[in-house]
Amino acid sequence: MRSPESSVSREPDARRGCKLDALAAVTQAVPQSVLPSSAPRWAHRWIIGRGVDLTFVIGSALAGYAYLVANVALHVPISLLWWFWSVGFDGTHIFGMASRTFFDAEARQRNRTLLFGSAAFFFALGPALILIGGKAVLAMIVAVWAYYHVIRQHYGFMVLYKVKNRDLAKTDSFLDRWFLGVMTVFPPFHRFFIHHPEELGLKFSFARMEPFFWVLVAATVVVYTGRQVLRIRRGDPINVPKFLLFAGVIPLHWLTFAYMSWMGAVPTVTIVHNLQYHALIWFHNRNRYRVGDHGLVPKAVSRSLLNYVLVALVFSALYRVPGFHLGQASDLAFGFFCGFGLTHYYLDSKIWRVRSDPGLRQALQMA
């Protein structure tokens, strides 16, 4: 039997416990909005490293701005800018893709049907379209797919930054995807399908629907901005690399298609893509080909940046220079050489699937 003293001494503790429980319940019931907002936290984990990301993944946009200024303000001939970009950056980035597919012995063995089947199909598609009078259709396929390929890569880097910085809320993922898509698709659509369809040889436009498209753009900006304000007020982490990527590429696309026709726009927006791709390929190859027997080319170009640059330039020149001259002389040759780009666009949509490829996750240090 407990003494009266022990009962009395424990009673206040019990009452205090009840009061604390009640206070906790009331505190948890207070709506979050009436609490003071937390200071935003800065999230800045990088894909490759701070310096490389800021220089080549995000800072690559500066190369696009340099092209814009060189052509529009300084009147450097677009033909000169085109050749410098085509051989120096675009053809070389296709070599980058080939270095981890066709030149990789393990990849050739594992994905033989994908690699050689797609190459056979796309190198035959161009000449087939030419033979049935579809050169304009082929040119449109190449142009639209090439631009989609560029913005899809920006999206891919955005996703990598989201994964790295745990920015994975479903609402934000949807809004990020929608915002980037609208803000990069609208500029060329506005130029070529509303105001200057003649630059693509089109006989129709969507000029009457222009107000609707501007409302769509404005609504996208308002909703996206509102979401970011809400996140800041809640004290959610701010994904710094993601927003730096947006700040680099989105204004570039708007300025490019405001001032340049397709001839100038192609190298201006694509050189950014090329530099990003080279940085990612170099990072991937250095990690993947350090050990194992993957073939002579991957081993050689992954050990020395100079080797990578020289081999890529030779590869690019060997098909870009004759491809241009033969394409001028023969439509069939033009169709055939389109196969390089089309095969690249297709394979690139297959070989960078981080979720389903453990080896890729390891090479990109995403595990």
Q: Over which residues does each language-model region extend?
A:
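N-terminal membrane topogenic signal
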Residues: 40-59
